[in-house]
A protein has these predicted regions:
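Bacterial Sec-dependent N-terminal signal peptides
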Residues: 1-11
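Formylglycine-dependent sulfatase
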Residues: 10-229
């Protein structure tokens, strides 16, 4: 995601998370070749830092909980994918990066979490958990995957609605709308967690990428999943 800000003097942070994107799809790691087109990531790489000795939990919820709290999964209790009400979920009493920045940093931050959550099940009693854990704004979906990128449920500060804008586009739109409300008196922290490229694989809007040669049929997707990655 690229945008122009008038906030360069502030220590603003945007943490972008891609879902189910392994380094085996990225040619800028040793002995690996691009199997997916990632032009924006490659552009970021030219002015950024590439870490080559980094480890994370191999599945979604423990990895997110680790980034969120800075603690191992045996500490947070989130040791596997959260798939049902019986799955261990993140204790809202955990100290999070959002709480630290919003409530305890020398200069307090505005905070937002936009996109996939997957630290709790999506039940009404938990819709405000992201806010309770340090975010001024939460807008996204709690589940491990959305069944349809063109229609899904969204929780926004404890209220559910149905979204019919393509999920990746809606996530960016929500982020830009929130950043437009920021000012130069207070820095911001944005956790931006895309559902993509997690399955279900599908034909994305032609306005976002080159879809030539892709039919979008279930047969083609099953036979050539990497083309839809």
């Amino acid at each position: 995601m690229f945008a122009t800000f008038k906030l360069q003097a502030q220590q603003n942070t945007i943490l972008i998370i891609a879902d189910d994107l392994g380094n085996d799809y990225l040619g800028f790691y040793p002995n690996l070749g691009d199997t997916a087109k990632v032009p924006n990531i490659r552009t970021l790489l030219t002015t950024g830092i590439r870490f080559t000795r980094v480890w994370a939990a191999p599945v979604c919820s423990p990895a997110r909980a680790g980034i969120f709290t800075g603690r191992y999964s045996f500490r947070t209790g989130v040791g596997n994918v959260i798939s049902s009400a019986t799955s261990p979920q993140l204790d809202t009493a955990e100290m999070s990066i959002a709480k630290l920045l919003r409530d305890y940093a020398p200069q307090k931050y505005n905070t937002a979490n936009i996109g996939k959550w997957h630290l709790h099940v999506q039940t009404p009693a938990k819709w405000l958990y992201p806010n309770r854990m340090g975010y001024d704004l939460y807008s996204g979906n709690f589940n491990g995957q959305i069944p349809n990128y063109y229609q899904y449920t969204r929780i926004k500060n404890g209220v559910m609605d149905t979204v019919t804008t393509y999920a990746t586009t809606q996530t960016v739109n929500d982020a830009l709308a929130w950043m437009d409300t920021m000012n130069t008196t207070k820095p911001f922290f944005l956790w931006l967690a895309f559902n993509a490229p997690h399955n279900p694989f599908h034909l994305p809007p032609a306005s976002l990428c080159d879809t030539s040669g892709l039919s979008g049929t279930a047969t083609d997707i099953s036979a050539n999943p990497k083309k839809y990655f």
